[in-house]
Design a protein with these regions (language model features):
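Short basic helix-loop element that most often maps to the first helix and adjoining turn
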Residues: 6-21, 25, 50
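Conserved hydrophobic/aromatic packing and binding residues within compact polymer-binding modules
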Residues: 8, 22-23, 33-36, 62
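Recognition helix of helix-turn-helix/homeodomain-like DNA-binding domains
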Residues: 26-42
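Short, basic-rich loop-to-helix N-cap that marks the start of a DNA-contacting helix
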Residues: 40-50, 71
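DNA major-groove recognition helix of helix-turn-helix/homeodomain DNA-binding modules
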Residues: 46-61
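Short, charged recognition helix plus adjacent turn
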Residues: 53, 63-75
Length: 75
């Protein structure tokens, strides 16, 4: 999960966007987006799809850490 959260933050920062900018793109508050990045709230698939398009990366790239179990194999 840590890689997933770090990747969300890194993608945002690599695109020179603030949390408020991304929240606006997603139609949510900055507080909610901050909770996504810190792992306090589950990010909906719809928002992940929007972010993958915004950042021009695959959904798999964003969620890679989440889709592996502790043995490193995909679910």
């Amino acid at each position: 999960m840590a890689l997933f959260l770090r990747r969300l933050r890194d993608l945002r920062e690599d695109n020179d966007l603030s949390q408020a900018d991304v929240a606006s793109i997603l139609g949510i508050s900055q507080t909610v987006y901050s909770r996504y990045e810190r792992g306090y709230q589950t990010i909906p698939l719809e928002h992940l799809l929007t972010l993958s398009k915004q950042y021009k990366v695959s959904l798999d790239y964003i969620t890679e850490d989440v889709t592996k179990n502790e043995n490193g194999r995909r679910h």
